[in-house]
């Protein structure tokens, strides 16, 4: 939560301005649940953003994961396409976030966040803007 909140604050961007989030999304029940809860809390007033996990397409690249996901996020902004969460056949029903299941989605993306969380509380959230 704080990493995303600080990224927004540093960039002087509101949660309502975010169009896309590249979640850390390792497909673990605890980790994904914590991230989802943080996103739902911080972005409670934003009803129009998409969130996906590109790890579903490439696997977990460990130390390189954050860099590769930042590239995915930059390409999402450039191409105006939210990448899919591959194999998300049964999303949680009460989640109101567009999780971009199974296939990419064309959408306007001006501001995007990419999250990278590590063992021991090493957390980063990078905010990117279309120019």
Predicted features by range, described:
Residues 1-131:
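Conserved "HGTGT" condensation-loop signature of ketosynthase/thiolase-family condensing enzymes
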């Amino acid at each position: 939560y704080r990493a995303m909140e600080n990224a927004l604050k540093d960039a002087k961007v509101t949660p309502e301005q975010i169009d896309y989030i590249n979640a850390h999304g390792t497909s673990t029940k605890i980790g994904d649940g914590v991230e989802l809860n943080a996103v739902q809390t911080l972005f409670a007033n934003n009803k129009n953003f998409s969130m996906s996990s590109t790890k579903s397409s490439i696997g977990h690249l460990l130390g390189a994961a954050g860099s590769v996901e930042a590239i995915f996020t930059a390409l999402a902004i450039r191409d105006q396409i939210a990448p899919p969460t591959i194999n998300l056949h049964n999303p949680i029903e009460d989640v109101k976030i567009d999780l971009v299941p199974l296939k990419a989605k064309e959408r306007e993306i001006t501001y995007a966040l990419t999250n990278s969380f590590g063992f021991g509380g090493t957390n980063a959230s990078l905010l990117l803007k279309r120019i």
